[in-house]
């Protein structure tokens, strides 16, 4: 029996058409699957004008489209894009996604990132999630960044085994910029068997939240040192 003809799929399809949808945040009924209008009012999607390099929103369009920080110290990433500003709205969705068996949120969150992914995507891309250490993976049972990457990427570009986290570093929460950089120093490595696949190819790194950019920077430096092409970052939300 094909999946499309399975009882579970057919029951789910019927329920999707006949039953009212519930908001993923407040649980109230909403017109479509996703977030109701009242909760969506708290969202801060990121859109142009923004810095071409780091993706920070700009107050108005600039001739060179670079923020002051990227003029002074450009990041190693070719570009970074985020779906939302990190606030109460995006925090609630991301925490549910990460810590409450929230894999059912993957399509909704993936759709929020789809336009940014399309803008960054180019032929020959590898789509690489920021990896979890195996201890954290066993505790959570899934890597939320890998699930987003799987949803966004063409099958032949999804590359979850290229980048490895070789040390179980402590959480970045509550650390300042310098502490975050130190905390992720030397954390990542490229799997030796993956180096030929990686060589010269552009990479889109997928993560959930960008605070200072320390994690994306450490991962990017690791990939570039292993011979990748340009590296781009895509996150659900970023702290401003």
What are these regions (language model features)?
Residues 1-240:
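Glycine-rich phosphate/pyrophosphate-handling loop used in enzymes and phosphotransfer proteins
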């Amino acid at each position: 029996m094909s999946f499309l003809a399975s009882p579970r799929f057919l029951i789910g399809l019927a329920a999707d058409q006949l039953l009212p949808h519930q908001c993923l945040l407040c649980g109230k009924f909403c017109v479509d699957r996703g977030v109701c209008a009242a909760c969506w009012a708290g969202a801060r999607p990121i859109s142009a004008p923004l810095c071409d390099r780091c993706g920070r929103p700009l107050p108005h369009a600039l001739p060179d489209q670079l923020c002051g920080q990227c003029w002074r110290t450009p990041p190693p990433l070719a570009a970074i894009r985020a779906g939302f500003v990190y606030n109460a709205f995006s925090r609630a969705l991301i925490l549910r996604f990460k810590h409450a068996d929230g894999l059912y949120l993957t399509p909704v969150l993936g759709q929020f990132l789809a336009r940014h992914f399309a803008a960054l995507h180019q032929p020959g891309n590898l789509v690489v999630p920021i990896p979890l250490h195996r201890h954290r993976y066993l505790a959570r049972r899934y890597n939320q960044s890998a699930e987003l990457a799987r949803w966004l990427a063409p099958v032949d570009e999804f590359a979850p085994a290229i980048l490895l986290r070789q040390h179980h570093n402590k959480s970045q929460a509550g650390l300042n910029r310098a502490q975050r950089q130190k905390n992720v120093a030397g954390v990542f490595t490229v799997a030796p068997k993956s180096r030929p696949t990686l060589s010269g190819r552009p990479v889109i790194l997928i993560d959930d939240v960008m605070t200072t950019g320390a994690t994306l920077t450490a991962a990017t430096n690791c990939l570039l040192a292993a011979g990748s092409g340009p590296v781009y970052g895509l996150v659900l939300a970023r702290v401003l």
